[in-house]
């Protein structure tokens, strides 16, 4: 896993207005020693039916939340 990779990430449980559930996320920082990553969740735009960053909502999560690798940008 490295910066720019896109994975499905399990963001549950969500609190308040956080995006939850299984989401495509892009990794923006890797903290290897702590087994943590900083990600930006993506969501589907109903107008274009494509994945977008609707709003920047960075989260730091455990690497154990990573599920399926999608691609690297």
Residue ranges and their predicted role:
Residues 8, 39, 63-67:
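Generic N-terminal initiation segments characterized by hydrophobic and/or small/turn-forming residues
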Residues 13, 44, 63-65:
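Non-catalytic surface loops within mature trypsin-like serine protease
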